[in-house]
């Protein structure tokens, strides 16, 4: 019997690729997205066409991670049809580019909502069922920016992803005794194959943005060019989706706590190794080493 898998933000990029990769492995996949009867209607059709052409079970579903009502309705429908959700992939996110000062506090709050609070909405809908069954997997799509090299003009996005990663780390320990596994997937700076940069938001304070542009002329273009140049040939976004599919397919108890897919090698893996080692040592010191592995 295959897994019932929910993927947020699955209209494009890592989400859409992951939905197809996991469905190809034989699982039933719900590709969550907004505006399924509007702007994302072509993506709904694309998912249905892929499902029919490849003989897999891939279904688009209306799931707006910014709305608890939408999340509850989607998870309620899936649970009514299958009785459970086995795997949840937190992929939904949004990026902004520009000088940090030029973003309003409200813009930072909106970004935090999409990248962090959205995971809490979905968790509150999905985790009660996983806890009741003492089984499940939560995959968090983080970012190498959390612990790796951080170029300028991406500060609000980096801060939000750091918040998401911190939440994932805490959830890992809190869910372990419930038998629910956590895997944190850390992509590097994939500048192609995703819609992050193409759909990135801009600062609302155009005066401040213009001042920075005058003083640091062309800096954002330089950052984009350098990030693209760091990635070796063949560094396709499917590396991330294929790794998520591999993790989902692993037997319970063998799924990794954290994995890096960073062809540019920005140092995130090295720093994460230290942080994760400190986490393990600390939990052992305070007598909570059992939280490092799921309870059968």
For the regions a language model picked out, list residue spans one by one:
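Conserved glycine-rich cofactor-binding loop
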Residues: 11-12
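Conserved glycine-rich Rossmann-like NAD(P)H-binding loop of the short-chain dehydrogenase/reductase
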Residues: 25-44
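The beta1-alpha1 cofactor-binding region of Rossmann-like NAD(H)/NADP(H)-dependent oxidoreductases
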Residues: 38, 61-73, 105
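Substrate-binding pocket helix/loop in short-chain dehydrogenase/reductase
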Residues: 99-100, 107-109
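A short, exposed helix-loop element centered on a Lys and neighboring polar residues
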Residues: 123-124
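Catalytic loop of short-chain dehydrogenase/reductase
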Residues: 139-163, 169, 173-176, 188-203
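SDR active-site lid
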Residues: 173-255
């Amino acid at each position: 019997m295959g897994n019932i898998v929910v993927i947020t933000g699955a209209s494009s990029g890592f989400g859409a690729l992951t939905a197809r990769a996991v469905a190809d492995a034989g699982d039933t996949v719900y590709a969550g997205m907004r505006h399924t009867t509007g702007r994302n209607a072509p993506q709904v059709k694309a998912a249905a066409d892929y499902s029919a052409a490849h003989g897999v079970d891939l279904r688009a579903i209306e799931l707006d991670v910014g709305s608890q009502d939408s999340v509850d309705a989607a998870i309620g429908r899936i649970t009514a049809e299958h009785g459970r959700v086995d795997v949840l992939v937190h992929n939904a996110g949004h990026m902004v580019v520009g000088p940090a000062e030029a973003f309003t506090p409200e813009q930072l709050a909106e970004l935090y909502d999409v990248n962090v609070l959205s995971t809490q909405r979905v968790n509150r809908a999905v985790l009660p069922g996983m806890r009741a069954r003492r089984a499940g997997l939560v995959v968090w799509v983080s970012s190498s920016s959390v612990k790796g090299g951080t170029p300028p003009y991406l500060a609000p996005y980096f801060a939000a992803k750091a918040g998401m990663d911190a939440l994932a780390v805490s959830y890992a320990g809190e869910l372990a005794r419930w038998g629910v596994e956590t895997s944190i997937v850390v992509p590097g700076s994939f500048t192609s194959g995703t819609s992050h940069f193409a759909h990135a938001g801009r600062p609302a304070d155009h005066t401040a943005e213009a001042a920075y542009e005058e003083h640091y002329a062309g800096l954002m273009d330089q950052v984009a060019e350098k990030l693209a140049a760091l990635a070796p040939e063949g560094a396709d976004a499917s590396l991330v989706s294929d790794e998520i599919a591999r993790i989902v397919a692993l037997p319970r108890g063998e799924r990794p706590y954290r994995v890096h897919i960073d062809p540019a090698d920005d140092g995130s893996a090295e720093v994460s190794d230290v942080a994760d080692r400190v986490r393990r040592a600390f939990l052992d010191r305070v007598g909570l080493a059992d939280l490092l592995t799921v309870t059968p």
